[in-house]
Amino acid sequence: MKKLTSILSLIVLVILAIWQYFTDTTKTKHQSSSPVIEQTKQTKVSEPKFEPKFEPKFEPKFEPQFETKRTDIEKSAVKNPDVFANYDVIMRNDHIGQNAKAPVDYYMLALSWSPGFCDIQREKYGDQLPYSSQYQCGNNRTFGWVVHGLWPQNANARAVSDHPRFCKGDLPALPKGLLAQYLAISPGEKLLQGEWEKHGSCAFDSAQQYFAKEQELFNALKLPNQKLSRDELFGWMKQHNPQLKNAYLRASRNELFICYDKKWQVMNCQSK
């Protein structure tokens, strides 16, 4: 009996020892695995957040558009022909006079910077502007570059009087309706009448043809809408008008001169 009891006690001790062994092993595994999980959690928590990098938005810089707006000019050129004053030009009153024998070798388009012209008029006359410039220089006008005239030129001229002028003599006043059509580019009925009599009549059969050619040449140009120095003006014109790139231009105070041959191709202007 004692022997049996001893055997049972031994078996119990062995079972307890085995149970204790597996219990300790399980705790060890549990303890050793916990830090790994926590580290993983910590690693996930501590991972740096990479926010997407956005390149700074590129804002294109646009250079000021200095081109004259035709629509503004047209709006400013509304004038009732019924209020035209006496705009006829009398040849004998012209201080240069007539030259009907001079040849026509080429043409010069004369453009005028209207704000500069009007400043001179105001300096000279104050508030009492002559009628011929009241429309162009009056309040609320938006004229920039305008056409002074299209002048037939003598290549051998040594003075203004050597160029063709008044080739058909003293002509009658043109119809008001015809002049009104071109006030948008040449703001003055007397200006238009005078340019036709003095210059246009030397190379064109009619005033309509003359003014239409002026308008055609003018509309083919891109023009700045602010005052520029001589060099800046030449540079701007050549940059924005490829047909002028290699041409010699001329300028005088508030005027720009572009020359054309008899086939209406751009050519070099003579230096004088």
Curated annotation (Swiss-Prot):
Family matches, as PROSITE patterns: RNASE_T2_1 (PS00530), RNASE_T2_2 (PS00531)
InterPro entries xrefs: RNase_T2-like (IPR001568), RNase_T2-like_sf (IPR036430), RNase_T2_His_AS_1 (IPR018188), RNase_T2_His_AS_2 (IPR033130)
A Pfam cross-reference name: Ribonuclease_T2
One Gene Ontology molecular-function label: RNA binding
UniProt keyword annotations, A-Z: Endonuclease, Hydrolase, Nuclease, Signal
GO terms, biological process: RNA catabolic process
Taxonomy, superkingdom: Bacteria
Active site positions: H148, E195, H199
Signal peptide location: 1-23
Family per record: Belongs to the RNase T2 family.
Protein name per Swiss-Prot or TrEMBL: Probable ribonuclease HI_0526
